[in-house]
């Protein structure tokens, strides 16, 4: 190549470079290689997961299929159940003969299948609170106590129709005598009419025909103690007298007998012509009126 041709080639290259620089559409694209990033963390994690899954599959596929003998009863009737606590190092087996679990590399479980040890629990003893509560129950059958409110509050109204031969008797003493011999009943006599009201049942009252014929008066002279039981049978009625304290006026036995005969005759007269109030009051107050009983 001579000097003229070299110069011409040099001009041609210069023109080509100026034309490319003046053209706005002609761009020079320079591609740079991407930066190198380290992706070792994600790849190692995925590879480790895959390795674990492979190990699990290989371990489960390579587990012993032959039956293991039970360490308790040495029976071959056993089966593989699962891995203890999801650990591949301790597989769990079940003995079908003695129904016990055991783990390879662990200890034999004495608890049978289904929790049989819970069935042998003793029943709890009854609490002391329940037994004490039964002992402290209230009494549903309290003792029946009679009270004589009407006679104690106003005894004069109760005995206004009672013709007593002995004026030394007081009404409270007569109430006590009537309660002592007729079973501690409470009476309530409505005076002024023909009505008589009893608050006690008639089955608790025991009558006798002639009460004052054999029962002397009290508080008339001196006292004598007598403990005896008199049983008088008349028309299937029984009267018991126990521990009564009697007062005699003078100590003369003949005077007392005469006094009783007078009262007995007076009672017969009242029985013939007396009113029903006197009759009932004689029954309630110990037979002072001398009237009959039935």
Swiss-Prot record:
Feature: compositional bias, Gly residues: 284-294
Stretches for region Disordered: 109-178, 247-294
Gene Ontology MF: a single term: DNA-binding transcription factor activity
Composition-biased stretches (Polar residues): 126-136, 157-173
Binding residues annotated for Zn(2+), in chain numbering: 70, 73, 95, 98
Keyword Phosphoprotein carried by entry: no
Domain of life assignment: Eukaryota
InterPro entries, A to Z: Dof, Znf_Dof
Record's keyword terms, sorted: DNA-binding, Metal-binding, Nucleus, Transcription, Transcription regulation, Zinc, Zinc-finger
Location relative to the cell: Nucleus
S-S bridge residues: none
Presence of the UniProt keyword Acetylation in the record: no
Entry GO terms, CC: nucleus
Composition bias type Basic and acidic residues, residue spans: 251-273
Function: Transcription factor that binds specifically to a 5'-AA[AG]G-3' consensus core sequence.
Record-given protein name: Dof zinc finger protein DOF4.1
């Amino acid at each position: 190549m001579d000097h003229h041709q070299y110069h011409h080639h040099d001009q041609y290259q210069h023109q080509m470079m100026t034309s490319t620089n003046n053209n706005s559409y002609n761009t020079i694209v320079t591609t740079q290689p991407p930066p190198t990033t380290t992706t070792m963390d994600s790849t190692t994690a995925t590879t480790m997961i895959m390795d674990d899954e492979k190990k699990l599959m290989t371990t489960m596929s390579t587990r012993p299929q032959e039956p293991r003998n039970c360490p308790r009863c040495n029976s071959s009737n056993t089966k593989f159940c699962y891995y203890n606590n999801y650990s591949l190092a301790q597989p769990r087996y079940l003995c079908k003969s003695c129904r016990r679990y055991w783990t390879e590399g662990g200890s034999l479980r004495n608890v049978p299948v289904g929790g049989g040890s819970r069935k042998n629990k003793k029943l709890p003893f009854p609490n002391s609170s329940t037994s004490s509560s039964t002992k402290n129950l209230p009494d549903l059958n309290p003792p029946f106590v009679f009270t004589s409110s009407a006679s104690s509050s106003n005894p004069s109204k109760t005995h206004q129709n009672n013709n007593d031969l002995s004026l030394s008797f007081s009404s409270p003493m007569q109430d006590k005598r009537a309660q002592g011999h007729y079973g501690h009943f409470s009476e309530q006599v409505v005076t002024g009419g023909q009505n008589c009201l009893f608050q006690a049942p008639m089955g608790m009252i025991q009558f006798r025909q002639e009460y004052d014929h054999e029962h002397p008066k009290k508080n008339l002279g001196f006292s004598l103690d007598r403990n005896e039981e008199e049983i008088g049978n008349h028309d299937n009625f029984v009267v018991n007298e126990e521990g009564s304290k009697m007062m005699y006026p003078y100590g003369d036995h003949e005077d007392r007998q005469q006094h009783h005969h007078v009262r007995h005759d007076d009672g017969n007269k009242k029985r013939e012509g007396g009113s029903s109030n006197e009759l009932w009051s004689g029954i309630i107050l110990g037979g002072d009126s001398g009237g009959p009983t039935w």
